[in-house]
């Protein structure tokens, strides 16, 4: 019985070691280390942290004006820290909406082609490692870094807000903030995936970066203009029936929902 017990323990340890030493997780750990130690990531996290602290300061100075007696959302006081703004600086939500895509693009535009240009990709593929394993590991590593950073920033805003206003968030407010951060991670993951796709498609990192930024600019700036032109051209007349007006509004709303920022 003792020998059987020892054998079972050794098998479990062997399985645990195989999981730790799996090529996928080895690449993930290596990519996380590269991201955290890179100047690019430090500059990005510095910019995003400063802008988030600026939006928090704006929200704290205007939280009294943001609360209105006839506002049904006035009971969610803690959530105003993430949405309140006086117009000088955008709110925390708008900052994530604007800077989140840049974060995903910055961590993914050279994920594959940089390895190819340095000659390390062929060395990795010469090992018994599948091509998809490398791509997925790079995506998971960048997503882990993004998730940790967004959760840290979100809880920092919550902590400073708690110290400033002295009112703790309710359970509903807390879970709303957590779900918002999770949604933000999915939003940034879309742009990270897009950047990795362009990194696979183009050999030069500059080309993949420009392609990713071009798609981001199109949906952030030009797509809204195009939808407004379409809405103006298809605008129903004053004699239109309520059914036609509702169909028109649903069509325009469907067009706007094609933009990732609008869905976010």
Q: What are the functions of these language-model segments?
A:
Residues 17-49:
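Aromatic- and glycine-rich beta-strand/loop motifs that create alpha-glucan
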Residues 38, 182-223, 228:
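A structural motif at transmembrane helix-loop-helix junctions in multipass membrane proteins
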Residues 40, 130-131:
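Short coil/turn motifs that cap or connect alpha-helices
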Residues 47, 87-114, 146:
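Long, hydrophobic alpha-helical segments
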Residues 52-61, 76-96, 137-196, 200-203:
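Secretory targeting signals
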Residues 59-83, 221-264:
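Terminal transmembrane helical anchor/hairpin motif
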Residues 104-108, 156, 194, 223:
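Hydrophobic/aromatic residues in alpha-helical transmembrane segments
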Residues 105-127, 139:
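Transmembrane helix boundary and interhelical loop/hinge segments in multi-pass membrane proteins
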């Amino acid at each position: 019985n003792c020998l059987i017990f020892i054998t079972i323990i050794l098998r479990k340890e062997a399985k645990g070691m195989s999981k730790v030493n799996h090529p996928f997780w080895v690449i993930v750990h290596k990519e996380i280390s590269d991201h955290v130690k890179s100047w690019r990531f430090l500059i990005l996290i510095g910019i995003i942290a400063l802008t988030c602290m600026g939006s928090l300061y704006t929200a704290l100075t205007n939280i009294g004006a943001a609360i209105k007696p006839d506002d049904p959302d006035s009971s969610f006081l803690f959530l105003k820290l993430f949405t309140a703004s006086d117009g000088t600086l955008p709110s925390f939500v708008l900052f994530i909406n604007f800077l989140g895509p840049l974060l995903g693009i910055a961590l993914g535009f050279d994920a594959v082609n940089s390895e190819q240009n340095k000659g390390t990709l062929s060395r990795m593929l010469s090992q018994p490692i599948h091509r998809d394993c490398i791509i997925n590991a790079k995506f998971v590593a960048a997503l882990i870094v993004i998730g940790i950073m967004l959760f840290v920033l979100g809880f920092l805003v919550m902590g400073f807000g708690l110290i400033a206003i002295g009112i703790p968030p309710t359970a509903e407010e807390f879970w709303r903030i957590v779900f918002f951060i999770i949604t933000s991670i999915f939003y940034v993951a879309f742009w990270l995936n897009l950047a990795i796709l362009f990194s696979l498609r183009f050999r030069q990192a500059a080309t993949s970066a420009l392609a990713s930024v071009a798609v981001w600019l199109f949906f952030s700036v030009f797509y809204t203009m195009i939808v407004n032109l379409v809405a103006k051209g298809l605008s129903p007349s004053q004699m239109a029936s309520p059914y036609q007006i509702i169909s028109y509004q649903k069509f325009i709303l469907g067009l706007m929902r094609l933009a990732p920022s609008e869905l976010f």
